[in-house]
Amino acid sequence: MIAFLPKNHSLINKQETGQYIYIYSFLFDELFSIEIGNDTPVTLTWSKNDSSLYFACIKSSPKIDEDEWKDVIQYRENSLRQKAVIYQIHFNFNDRVLSTETNIIRNLSLLIGKLVYVSFSEKLIFSSVSQLIEDMNDFELYSIDLRNSTAEPSRLTYNEGLEFQLQVSNDGQYLLFRMLSLGSNKELFNHTQYRLYSLNLIDNKLTRLAEHFEGNINQYAMKSDSSIYILGQLGTEVHVYSQDLSMKDLVYHNGWNGTYELIACSRKNQSIAFVYSSFERSMEIYLINDITELKSAQSITDENQLITERNLPKIEVYSWKNDDDHRTIEGILHYPPEKFQSKNLPLLVFIHGGPYWASLNSLDLGWYQWTTLAASQGWLVLEPNYRGSTGYGDQFLNEIRYKPLSRPGKDILYGIDQLIKDGIVDRNRLAIGGYSYGGFLTNWLITQTKRFNAALSGAGVVDFTSAWATMDLPILLGYLFGELPWKIPHTYLNESPIYQLDRVCTPTHIVTGEKDVRVPAAQSYMLERGLHFRNIPVKLITFPKEGHSLRNNPWHGKIKVREELKWLQKYGNQSCTQHVESTRNHSIRQELTYYFLFLFFFIM
């Protein structure tokens, strides 16, 4: 059976306001719905023999002091009231009729991110989370002994990191998980690349796997024996590795260049399924009988045939140096079709988010990553893996700290300089854009140079002090800047574009989600107002009911890309200095108008 939690019940003909879990039975080829009340389910896990299901919910907040407070929200108090509850559902099928019995396992004072069942010791293990990511102590691992109904949860880790993708080893003695650390008060974890760990559930010993791997751990999968497959990123490539849990060394498995995105293994034999793509192959699912068949794998899906029939842009990896510290920076160049390695091309700098992520050799055609479409419109597209990107070692990644805009910004500007020196790019036809941290850097770079004819800012920040105070991830900014705003106000001021908008001349298109809590929409409104007051061409569009990711309405992503392409077409070939002259003339006319109005009222 398969159990799942839909985000939208209407997609499967459910209009009720209550919450449901859905069970698909392979035996009966039928989908069953189970009503679970009003508590919001967040994660679930099967018992050993699939006879029951454990799931965790966010418990509906009790209405305390409603007569006194009415509909008034007490901000932090309301957040602290949110608790979790774990349930167990027992299943019974009789004549294709599903009957269930639901019991409460635990009421918890924590919120739960992920839940897994350990048959070896009859325990549930869960990761704790918090809506406000202010303290890394809120994100740890706990266990619940199902054999003792009164026992309190036992804390397993003190990692001060974000643990996710929890899996239990086949023998039930180890818990594997990936972790992202943003520094540690105990100085245990100071790296910030994604890592893989194994927790011994008998003695609680924590072991880092793939310890000598210099890159980023993107995914992993348990094999049928005591070993794992790992998808590891080095530079712009993601390849397949394996490691025995009793060994330290990784084994590299020779496959195609590109990005292995997801991987799953059979626990009965050597079969492996994986998702793969590159700029030469569209994303599909592949199935092989053994890891030695990686290079001869055949896809079992054909969902992107239309894409393969197109004349796609060709790419190459491009390197340059930041002349300030001689650090080598790498990026991906997307050439327009039929113009591979041509010269004097218009350039669009397309900046990835994160910052702890990277542009990869993969074919992604969504609203967030539309470099292929931009190149097909005639642009040479540069995706720079600036300081802070994963896949280039911990030191490279951590060099973004203390100069979170200015240092990666210089990485990007030196890359543009080198492309111009090499004759690849026309210096008079430059544009820039990015989303999330890519929007942060876009906003910064248009204050540092007048060379860009057009800019595309998505979910970007212009004032990092107010962003720290209003976003749901203040710990990220505290880590990037090195301290809290009132302790180093000069750094927050110097790295915030809002205080340098007088230097901008680039026409800027801005997008934001109306309900974005990761990068609040107010930041985009601040940028729009500042540029409008300076008479710089600017347009802001907001997407209703959308958060940081535009996932609620597919039209929103399409409209975003459509309007950004229009902006590039309108302004991409016009020099920024034309707008400076236009702005100067407008200011002179405005001053003359005020002068004559003053004279008129003075004479009257």
Question: Would you name each region that the model predicts?
Answer:
Residues 2, 50-53, 124, 172-175, ...:
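Hydrophobic beta-strand positions that form the internal "hydrophobic ladder"
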Residues 3-22, 36-41, 56-86, 105-111, ...:
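A flexible loop/linker signature enriched in serine peptidases of the S9 family
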Residues 25-29, 90-94, 145-149, 200-204, ...:
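Short loop/turn segments that connect beta-strands within beta-propeller blades
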Residues 48-49, 119-120, 170-171, 223-225, ...:
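Residue-level detector of Asp-centered blade-edge/turn motifs that repeat once per structural unit
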Residues 182-201, 206-221, 254, 258-261, ...:
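Beta-propeller and related beta-repeat scaffolds in trafficking/envelope systems
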